[in-house]
């Protein structure tokens, strides 16, 4: 998008907004003009972003985002401390918590192993993970079913199995209400692998 006719601060705002995931130049332009027309909304948004940037940090135990360290999940008295779920991103913890099914602890990797993007195990929080395994009996791998997610799960399972820890993987398969006819072969194969007795 050509920003030459815009004043520099407006062009910079559009450029900044377009750097956000899922926001293209046209949407960024619409958002920028909206924010200019709604100064109170813009001011509140700016204050909220600055506050979040200032107050949110990684939990020293699980690496999830929190405003208390350690986070409420890690300090929760009703949590099953022998069960640890490894996820890619903090938003994955939110998704799993919404189900109210998982009662253990979490560990957030903040990414996956991706050699093409220059991300190796040392760029993830694996060293912190290895330092908190005392008393853990089972680790649940909850990475996304991507090539990188699978590679990360395999890498971690090779590290954890020699320690005598049971390593499991969440099942992947058909969504509720999904039709077999529209599912790809990998999804159907995973659904068959993850089948259980009824």
From Swiss-Prot:
Query: Keyword ATP-binding: yes or no?
Result: no
Q: Which GO terms describe its biological process?
A: DNA recombination; DNA repair
State the UniProt keywords alphabetically: DNA damage, DNA recombination, DNA repair, Metal-binding, Zinc, Zinc-finger
The residues covered by the Toprim domain are 82-175
Keyword flag Transcription: no
Zinc finger (C4-type) residue numbers: 59-74
Give GO terms: molecular function aspect only. Answer: DNA binding; zinc ion binding
Name the CDD domains on file: TOPRIM_recR
Its biological purpose? May play a role in DNA repair. It seems to be involved in an RecBC-independent recombinational process of DNA repair. It may act with RecF and RecO.
The record's family statement is: Belongs to the RecR family.
Protein name in the entry: Recombination protein RecR
Q: Which gene encodes it?
A: recR
């Amino acid at each position: 998008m050509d920003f030459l006719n815009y004043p520099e601060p407006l062009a910079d705002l559009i450029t900044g907004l377009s750097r956000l995931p899922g926001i293209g130049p046209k949407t960024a332009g619409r958002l920028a003009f909206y924010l200019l027309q709604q100064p109170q909304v813009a001011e509140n948004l700016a204050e909220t972003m600055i506050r979040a940037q200032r107050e949110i940090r990684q939990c020293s135990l699980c690496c999830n985002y929190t405003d208390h360290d350690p986070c409420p999940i890690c300090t929760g008295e009703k949590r099953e401390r022998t069960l640890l779920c490894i996820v890619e991103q903090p938003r994955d913890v939110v998704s799993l918590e919404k189900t109210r099914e998982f009662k253990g602890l979490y560990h957030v990797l903040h990414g996956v192993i991706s050699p093409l993007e220059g991300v190796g195990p040392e760029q993830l929080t694996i060293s912190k993970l290895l330092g908190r395994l005392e008393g853990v009996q089972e680790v649940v791998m909850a990475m996304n079913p991507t090539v990188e997610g699978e590679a990360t799960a395999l890498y971690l399972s090779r590290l954890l199995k020699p320690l005598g820890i049971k390593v499991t993987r969440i099942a992947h398969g058909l969504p509720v209400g999904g039709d077999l006819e529209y599912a790809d072969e990998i999804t159907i194969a995973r659904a068959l692998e993850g089948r259980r007795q009824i």
